Amino acid sequence: ASGGPSWWKTPAGQKILTPDLYAKTLVPLLKPLGLKILLEPGRFMSGNAGALVTRVEYIKKTGKKNFVIVDAAMNDLIRPAFYDSFHEIVPLTKKTGALVSSDVVGPVCESGDYFAKDRPLPKVGEGDTLALLSAGAYGSVMGSNYNSRSLPAEILVRGRKASVVRRRQV
């Protein structure tokens, strides 16, 4: 990670604001006023604790664009649509060869139903499984039934043991 803790995944060159840097910057300004700093550490503490696993439904090429349409949608992880947040996307089957500039999008007919735009990714195909990383903070609580879509299952992994903590909604 660039400028942050070694475990926090960010796009190359992006510096994150750590609690330490935040405090070093604000304490000198706020202390003379008798004010305290409070922060809500959700994303910082749990962001990398989750991944959204999705399957490639099909590939669509139009002109210079390569669309990777997946079965997850903006209702499963809204942060890219709301905040243009970066989530590393990793094929769960090792891929070789040149990277392809790809837009990873969901099946909901909305302009905001995307997970990545113009992202260099290994060439993937129908049926491949992808993991969208850093989805632990707010991924679940911001999920919705938008467009009559069901909420996905949630799996807790501890060591080599996996447990269903929320069944897929039907």
Where are these regions (language model features)?
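Acidic, glycine-rich loop-and-beta core segments that form the ion-binding/anion-interacting portion
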Residues: A1-L38
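Charged (often Lys/Glu-rich) extended helix/loop segments that serve as interaction or gating elements
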Residues: T25, L33-V170
